[in-house]
């Protein structure tokens, strides 16, 4: 991957994490392409985009890299948020999470990832690990059976499209929840892989005609919006973590595709103006840490605003983990502060790791 493609994908990652944070603050960065209609599909797409074919013949290297890059930091964060949750419980009398048990610390992360409310966005990390592992073995099998990109695309499309009907035909247990999430996310991983290998350098899908078609399709999709009184999202939303698709069967697939296209289009359009902004490049490099820490930062901002306005912290206990103080006035302040603070937290963490831990492991 050359520097231009690397920087483009880094800015795309920065946009993706901003969409996650803006979604949790209930506003849309991309207008009619609302975050809860595609934000995590975009991250799965990026993972497929970055997948290297060399792993198809080197499973050990793939597993070693994924465990070190995804699961090891995940459980360090799990330990950190265990401590934070216990401290907050001691100070406020509210336990933001599930009971502290061996199962909830080690097993629940692979089921729903909501053992601690403040770190619940990290459910995506363990799901990504499972999805990419399944993707690796499926790709190995498919290439042996029939090494044809259209056949592979049809296969993964069928898998993805069957996920939503399955959620309506079966009881959503911890096991079926993982199956449904994996099925749907596999489609977007392969879509990213397909785009990187067969579309990006061969077809221009960002022409005015493409833009008109995608905007028209999105306008039609809004006719199917059921999110009139949103608890999650701000239109056309679905909640993949809980396999909640409401009354929809296929619309979430289409809104994910249009949202991914819109994100790619925005990055292509603005790349000449954004490529030299170091903060955006840094943000794209620390999306894991932003995902992990943004709810904690919002919680702290809320505590400060409550204190400034003379409101007891007990008011915070009456709401869920996503609640913020006076959202009409403060939403964008939360967004800017959260993105800045979590980005620099991530930068500091990466520098500390490089200085303190990398030399130790390099000697082994």
Question: What is the predicted function of each stretch?
Answer:
Residues 1-364:
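Alpha-helical transmembrane segments and their immediate juxtamembrane cytosolic regions
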């Amino acid at each position: 991957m050359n520097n231009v493609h690397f920087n483009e994908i880094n800015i795309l990652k920065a946009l993706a994490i901003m969409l996650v944070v803006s979604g949790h603050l209930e506003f849309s960065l991309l207008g009619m392409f609302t975050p809860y209609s595609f934000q995590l599909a975009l991250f799965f797409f990026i993972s497929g985009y970055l997948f290297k074919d060399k792993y198809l013949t080197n499973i050990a290297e793939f597993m070693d890299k994924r465990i070190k890059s995804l699961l090891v930091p995940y459980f360090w964060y799990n330990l950190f948020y265990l401590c934070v949750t216990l401290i907050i419980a001691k100070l406020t009398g509210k336990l933001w999470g599930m009971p502290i048990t061996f199962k909830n610390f080690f097993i629940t992360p692979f089921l729903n990832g909501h053992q601690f409310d403040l770190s619940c966005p990290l459910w995506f990390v363990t799901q990504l690990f499972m999805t990419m592992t399944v993707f690796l073995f499926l790709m190995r099998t498919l290439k042996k059976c029939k090494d044809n990109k259209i056949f592979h695309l049809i296969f993964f499309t069928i898998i993805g499209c069957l996920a939503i009907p399955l959620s309506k035909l079966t009881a959503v247990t911890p096991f079926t929840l993982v199956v449904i999430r994996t099925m749907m996310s596999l489609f977007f991983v392969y879509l990213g892989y397909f785009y990187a290998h067969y579309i990006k350098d061969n077809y221009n899908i960002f022409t005015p005609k493409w833009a008109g078609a995608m905007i028209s399709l999105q306008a039609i999709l809004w006719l199917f919006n059921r999110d009139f009184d949103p608890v999650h999202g701000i239109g056309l939303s679905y909640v993949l973590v809980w396999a909640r698709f409401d009354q929809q069967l296929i619309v979430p697939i289409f809104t994910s595709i249009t949202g991914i296209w819109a994100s790619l289009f925005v990055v292509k359009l603005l790349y000449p103006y954004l490529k030299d902004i170091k903060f955006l490049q840094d943000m794209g490099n620390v999306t894991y840490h932003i995902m992990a820490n943004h709810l904690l930062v919002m919680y702290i901002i809320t505590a400060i605003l409550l204190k400034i306005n003379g409101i007891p912290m007990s008011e915070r206990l009456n709401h869920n983990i996503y609640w913020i103080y006076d959202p009409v006035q403060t939403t964008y302040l939360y967004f800017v502060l959260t993105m800045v603070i979590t980005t620099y937290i991530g930068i500091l963490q990466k520098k500390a790791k490089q200085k303190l831990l990398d030399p130790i492991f390099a000697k082994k």
